[in-house]
From Swiss-Prot:
This is Uncharacterized PPE family protein PPE38. The gene is PPE38. It holds the Pfam family PPE. It comes from Mycobacterium tuberculosis (strain ATCC 25618 / H37Rv). One of its GO terms (biological process) is response to host immune response. Belongs to the mycobacterial PPE family. PANTHER family: GLUTAMINE-RICH PROTEIN 2.
């Protein structure tokens, strides 16, 4: 460090020491140490007075003596710490004083700058050598500035080192906080161990009791009469099944009867509708093939009756008149065309086919369909009846 100061010109040494914070922080540190020392000393005095008052006053006995013995080292440590704080404050003050001395011994940077400016001017104007003595004197002054700064820095270094060497480290308190923490940890560990030891049998008993509970539940479930319960349920369902079967049959019968009733009602309605027409035809004589029912267009056929078996029938009956001769003028009971029976309706009778020679072979379908429950069916005669003319 001395070598560094020696090799540095005054421009650097002077600029460093004057550009720093100065001795203010050192004096502030010294004041803080002094305050700490005063607080420690006051605490030690107060603690000692309290312990002494308790031991000499109402608190007496072995506990009082033990407490006083335990507090004595702490009081001593407080007093020692207060002394060390006072020493640190003194050393900080000494360091600040050394700095002030070094600062005062160091050449001011302005003087160094002036010397360098003067040297430059003398060299610039030294045309004939007239400034040589002045230049030498200026250089000598500069060397002295160099030496002065180095001496100041060396002295400051020596003073700061002496201050640092006289400082002693603070002693640790007599109360071992780590020991207390370890002791508390050991106590907590012991408590946890004891609690675990106390709870282990309970937990083991609970775990061991679980299989027994499961086995008991399984045995109870196995003992339940599940099959018997199912059989009882099936037996309880038998009456319902027995009742549902006849009810379904009755429902089907009702449906069939409804269909038959509708068909009968339809047949009865048709017959009832034809009764007035039939009666009117009888009264007027047109329903039996009279002149009023046939019209003027059928006058050529009035004398030609149709034969159904051994019975003569009017030519207006459906089935006895050829399809080509049918006319809308034929009004009457026999002129109604045969209807195709609907599904589920009364069964009508188809018109019987014509026999050989053009003779009719059966009853009209309209008459056969209105015959009621027991219609009279006229069987066809398998013979050829000759046609007999009128007049």
């Amino acid at each position: 460090m001395i070598l560094d100061f020696s090799w540095l010109p005054p421009e650097i040494n002077s600029a460093r020491i004057y550009a720093g914070a100065g001795s203010g922080p050192l004096f502030m540190a010294a004041a803080a140490w002094e305050g700490l020392a005063a607080d420690l000393r006051a605490s030690a005095s107060s603690f000692d007075a309290v312990i002494a008052g308790l031991a000499a006053g109402p608190w007496s006995g072995p506990a009082s003596v033990a407490m006083a013995g335990a507090a004595a080292p702490y009081v001593g440590w407080l007093s020692a710490a207060a002394g060390q704080a006072e020493l640190s404050a003194g050393q900080a003050t000494a360091a600040a004083t050394a700095f002030e001395a070094a600062l005062a011994a160091t050449v001011h940077p302005a003087a160094v700058t002036a010397n360098r400016v003067l040297l430059g001017a003398l060299v610039a104007t030294n045309i004939l050598g007239q400034n040589t003595p002045a230049i030498a004197a200026t250089e000598f002054d500069y060397v002295e500035m160099w030496a002065q700064d180095v001496g100041a820095m060396v002295g400051y270094h020596a003073g700061a080192a002496a201050v640092a060497e006289t400082l002693t480290p603070f002693s640790v308190p007599p109360l071992d906080l780590a020991g207390l923490a370890s002791q508390a940890g050991a106590q907590l560990t012991g408590m946890a161990t004891s609690v675990s030891a106390a709870l282990s049998p309970i937990a083991e008993g609970a775990v061991e009791g679980v299989p027994a509970v499961v086995a008991a539940a399984q045995s109870v479930a196995a003992g339940l009469p599940v099959d018997a319960a199912l059989q009882v349920g099936q037996a309880a369902a038998y009456p319902a099944s027995m009742l549902i079967g006849p009810m379904m049959q009755l429902a089907q019968m009702g449906t069939t009867a409804n269909t038959a009733g509708l068909a009968g009602a339809e047949a009865a309605g048709l017959a009832a509708a034809d009764v007035p027409t039939f009666a009117g035809d009888i009264a007027s004589g047109t329903g039996l093939g009279g002149a009023g029912g046939l019209g003027a267009g059928m006058s050529a056929e009035l004398g030609k009756a149709r034969l159904v078996g051994a019975m003569s029938v009017p030519p207006t009956w459906e089935g006895s008149v050829p399809a080509r001769m049918a006319s809308s003028a034929m009004a009457g009971l026999g002129a109604m065309p045969a209807e195709v029976p609907a599904a589920g309706g009364p069964m009508g009778m188809m018109p019987m086919p014509m026999g050989m020679g053009g003779a009719g072979a059966g009853m009209p379908a309209g008459m056969m369909g209105r015959g009621g429950a027991n219609p009279h069916v006229v069987q066809a005669r398998p013979s050829v009846v000759p046609r007999v003319g009128i007049g």
